[in-house]
Amino acid sequence: MIFLTLEHIFTHISFSIVSIVITIHLMTLLVDGIVGLYDSSEKGMIATFLCITGFLVTRWIYSRHFPLSDLYESLIFLSWSFSIIHMVPKIRNHKNHLSAITAPSAIFTQGFATSGLLTEMHQSAILVPALQSQWLMMHVSMMVLSYAALLCGSLLSIALLVIRFRKNIEIFGKDNYLLIGSFSFGESQYVNERSNILRNTSFLSFRNYYRYQLIQQLDHWSYRVISLGFIFLTIGILSGAVWANEAWGAYWNWDPKETWAFITWTIFAIYLHTRTNKDLQGANSAIVASIGFLIIWICYFGVNLLGIGLHSYGSFTLTSN
C-alpha cells in the first residue's frame, strides 16, 4: 500500500512542477532577461526528474521487474527521458531553450499516462512469459530513449521549417543569447564562422542575419539530437532481434511493431544521408525529419491501439465512465 501511495505522490508532484515550469518559460519568452524565473524553471525540471526517478524506482521495487512492461510505464519513462534531454545543457552550463520542446513533451506524455484512459495499467501486474527476460531493460529502454531524442530532433526540424518559410519572423527578446547559446554546447563558433560571411554582405538586413543564425542553430542541433536518437534506435532494434530469437525462435517476424520500427529506422537513415549532401541540408532534411515525427507516433502507439501482433502485450483499451 505504501508503494502505491508513493507512486501517486511522485506522479502528481512531478506533473504539477512541470506545469509550473512551462508557465515560467512562457513568461521568460515574453519578458526577456528575467534570470530569477529562468533559474527557477531549471530547478523545477530537476525536481521533476527526481520525482519521476522516484516513481520508477518505487515501481521497480514494488513490481520486482524493470518498469517498462506496458504503455503506462513506457510513457512515464518517456517523460523521464525528456527531462534528461532537458538537463543536458544545464550540466554544461549553457542557456537551455530546448525546454520549449522538452517541458511540454514531458507534461503531455505524463498527462496522458496518468489520465483515465490508462487506469487499468496503473496497477502493476505479473510479467507475461515473453517479457521475463534480462533483455527487457536493454531493448525497451533503448527504444524509448530513441523515441524521446528523435521526437525532440524532429520538433526542432519542424521549428526550422516554420521559421524558414515564414515571411515575417519575430525573434523572442532583444539579446542574441537565444541565438548563440540556446542549443549549443560549444559549437557556436561553427555558427559564428558561417554567419560572419553574411555579416559583411549588403543585401541581408539585421533581422535576416539573426534569423539565419537561428535557422543554423536549429539545423545543427536537430542533426545532433536525431543522430543520438538513431544510435539508440539501432541498438534497440538489434537487442530486440536477439531477444526475439530467444523468445520466439526468429530474429525478425515482420509483425506491426517491427515493421513500423523498420520504417522509422529507414526514415531517419534517409535523413542522415541527406545531411551528407550539402545541397539537401536545411529545409530538405528538415522535411524528412518532420515526416519522421509522424512515423514515430505511429510506431509507438499503433500496435497499442490495434492490439495485434507479437507486441500486443502492451496494448490498452479505452475506458469509459
From Swiss-Prot:
Q: Which UniProt keywords apply?
A: Chloroplast, Cytochrome c-type biogenesis, Membrane, Plastid, Thylakoid, Transmembrane, Transmembrane helix
Q: Where are the transmembrane segments?
A: 17-37, 43-63, 71-91, 98-118, 143-163, 225-245, 258-275, 286-306
| GO annotations of cellular component type | chloroplast thylakoid membrane; plasma membrane
Location(s), subcellular: Plastid, Chloroplast thylakoid membrane
What's the protein's topology in the membrane? Multi-pass membrane protein
Where in the sequence is the signal peptide annotated? Answer: none
Q: Which GO terms describe its biological process?
A: cytochrome complex assembly
- This protein's major location comes to plastid
Please give one Gene Ontology molecular function term for this protein.
Answer: heme binding
Q: Which InterPro entries match?
A: Cyt_c_assembly (IPR002541), Cyt_c_biogenesis_CcsA (IPR017562), Cyt_c_biogenesis_CcsA/CcmC (IPR045062)
User: Which family would the database say this protein is a member of?
Assistant: Belongs to the CcmF/CycK/Ccl1/NrfE/CcsA family.
Q: HAMAP family per the record?
A: CytC_CcsA
On assembly, the entry states: May interact with Ccs1.
Q: What is this protein called?
A: Cytochrome c biogenesis protein CcsA
Lineage of the native species? Eukaryota, Viridiplantae, Streptophyta, Embryophyta, Tracheophyta
